């Protein structure tokens, strides 16, 4: 799931009502990963996960996606078939 915000900020995410673990990626305006949390379990609720720096997008994927695709901080992500978002 992709979350798109009007401006970059330190948006927090939690695992309330989730049934499975996920990876979370916070991306800047250019789609570059600025923070990530891997294999976040539903049992972490009510903890809230915040990026270290402001981000404009948050992408949630199945757990293990970051490891499988060697995604780390600084990795640029290209989202195919996504509309361009402008301010």
Label every PLM stretch briefly.
Residues 1-87:
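Compact, glycine-rich, soluble single-domain proteins
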